[in-house]
Amino acid sequence: MTIETAVVQTPLGPVTLYARGGALVGLEFTDRAARRAALERRLRRHLGRFELREVRDPAGARSALEAYFAGDPHALSGQQVELHGTPFQLAVWRELRCIPPGRTLSYAALAARVARPRAVRAVGQANGSNPVSLFVPCHRVIAADGGLGGYGGGLARKRRLLELEGRTVA
């Protein structure tokens, strides 16, 4: 099996994209080589053996990212993604895709949306396991007090992503 890949320079640092069959299967901010290696290990665990082939625009994700960072907050919404996770993770990730740009949701509200209102920490863990952040917008989930909460790509990136979408967070 072949996985298409590309490194895209963004205002928030380099992002490595992975796609197969027209769908994005992985995305990671790869300012540290260890992050890229960790994502490739996760992909192998879910997809099995594969070879990487560098292409310009895997599954159109580079074009979508460029449009997003050029000011179109909806550019990432239509991207086809292929997700692999537990049934709970998949439910959380589906709900994340329903949060529109410029809006945020608390971890508790997201837990309620997946019919697991007491699973707030599990929602946070599912967010942290999101293999295609930005396209499955886990950065739109914030703490109940309105603070940023967490973000695997770093809180400075999360704040900047929300600002790009017109949302200011304390």
Regions found by a protein language model. Name each.
Residues 100-103, 127, 131:
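Flexible interhelical turns and helix-capping residues at alpha-helix boundaries
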Residues 144-170:
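…primarily DNA-binding HTH/wHTH and HhH modules…
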Residues 134-141:
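Short Lys/Arg-enriched helix C-cap and helix-to-coil transition segments
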Residues 96, 121-129:
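Major-groove recognition helix of helix-turn-helix-like DNA-binding domains
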Residues 41, 124, 159:
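Active-site phosphate/pyrophosphate- and oxyanion-stabilizing loops and adjacent acidic/basic residues
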Residues 76-83, 123, 148-151:
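Short clusters of hydrophobic/aromatic residues that line enzyme substrate/ligand-binding pockets
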Residues 1-117, 164, 168-170:
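Basic nucleic-acid-binding alpha-helical/helix-turn surface characteristic of O6-alkylguanine DNA
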